[in-house]
Amino acid sequence: MILLFLLYFSSSLWGQSRDVTEYVDSMIGNSDSRWMQFPGPAMPFGMVKLSPDNQGNVWRGGYEYKINQIIGFSHIHSWTMGGLLTMPVTGPLKIKPGEENEPDSGYRSRINHKNEKASLSYYSVLLDDYNIKAELTSTTRTGFQRYTFPKSDSSRILFDLENGSEYPYEVRWASISKVSDYEIEGFSTQSSYDEPTNLLNDYTVYFVARVDKPMKSFGTWVNGYVDTTSSICWGRHDIGAFMNFDTEEGEIIQLKTAISYVSIEQARKNLEVESGGFGWNFDAVRKYAVNEWRKILSTIEIEGGTEEDKRKFYTNLYRSPVGGIKIAHI
C-alpha cells in the first residue's frame, strides 16, 4: 500500500514538473503531410529548416514515414521553397538520389525506424547502406550535423542543389567552389511554380559549408559530368559537389552550414555570428535551441488532460512558429 502511494505521488509530482519541451514530438504528423511539416530540427521562424527527405517531386513531398529510406537532409522546407541537400555516404560515387523501388540506383539509403530519433531541436538516424549515424540540430540561420562514419577510404559528404520537393523547382544558375580544405561556398538561383496562383517563385539561396576535418579531395558534377579535380563549377539543373575523406571506425566529422537570401558574405556572417560561439560543440547548439524553444512553449500552461493530450498540444504549439520563416538577416 505504501509502495503504491509512493509510486502515485512520485509520478504525479513528475507530471507537474515535467519540462514543456519534453512534450514536443516532431515525428507526429509526418505521414501524408505537407512539405512544411517535417521531423527535423528548426528554430521558431527559422530560415534553416534542416530535415530528412525521402521523396521526389510529388505533392505532399518531403518526408514520408511509410518510406524506409532517406535521400538526404535539405535545409529549406518552406512553402514553394527548397534547396541545399547534404548526404554522408561511403563507397562508389553516386550523384543521383535513385528511385524508391531501386534504392541501389542512387545515393539514398535504407533506414530502420527503430534507429531513428526525433525530439525538440534534434534528429538522428542510422543510414543502413553506409553504416553512418547522422545527427542534426540547428540555429535560426545555420545547420549543424554530426556524422559518425565507419572505417573507409571512400567516405564523403554530398551537396546536391537540385532535389525533390512538394513544389518542384528548377536550378536556373548555380555555382559551388572550394574555399579551403575545410570550407566550400556557393549559390543556387531557383524558380518554382505555384499552380494555384499561376505564379513563378524566383529566389537565390547563398550558402557556406564548413567541416571540422580537412577534406582529402573535392569534386563536382554538372548534369551527369563528374570532375574530380575541379575546385569550382557553374551550371544549371543538376549540379552538386562532394568532399572526400578517409575515416576510421567510429570517427566523427561535423558539418556546419549557413544560408542567406542576400549574399555568400551574409551566409558566412550568419555562420560566424550564430554558430561561431559554440565552436564544434554540437550538444551546446542543441541545448541553446531547446532553451530558446522553452521561452515560447512555457508561455502557455495547461491544466488537466492526459500526458498524451499535453504531447499533442505542445507539439501543435511548436508547429505554429516552425511554419513561418525569418527572412531578415543579422
Predicted features and spans:
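Bacterial Sec-dependent N-terminal signal peptides
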Residues: 1-17
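Accessory carbohydrate-recognition regions in carbohydrate-active enzymes
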Residues: 16-330
